Amino acid sequence: DVYKRQDVMVIADGEQIRRVIHNIISNAIKYMDKPKGIIQIRIKDVGDFIQIEIEDNGKGIGPKDLPYIFDRFYRTDVSRNSSKGGSGIGLSIVKKILEDHGGKVWATSRLGIGTIMYFVLRKYQEVPMK
């Protein structure tokens, strides 16, 4: 189920979640190498959680790098060989923020095709008064 113009409430610090989304989208833009770059954002209902997917059609992440992209100071081959490379702490901060909120983050990617970053946050559910 993809949400369309529907309010979704999660248990989270809004500023921290904005930081997560900003970091992921900034990385997608930073490593975009196509003249017509595309970034898609989807929000899905997955039981007690909301899943956010941020997909790009950028350079992608190689299979040997993918398991480590959320490790502190890890830089992929693409970022090490790029003048745009960062410090390697951005995605580790994303992971920490999401874990502190009871969520998690992961990614799938194919070199030359792009990357999908996924993260989940627990939905807010009102407890009925007795």
PLM regions: where:
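Short, small-residue-biased leader/transition segments that mark boundaries at the very start
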Residues: 2-3
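Conserved micro-motifs of the catalytic ATP-binding
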Residues: 9-12
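Short beta-strand/loop element within the Bergerat-fold HATPase_c
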Residues: 38-48
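Acidic ATP/Mg2+-coordinating residue in the GHKL
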Residues: 56
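Short conserved segment of the HATPase_c
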Residues: 61-75
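Short alpha-helical Gxxx[C/S/T] motif in the catalytic ATP-binding
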Residues: 90, 94
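Conserved glycine-rich
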Residues: 102-103
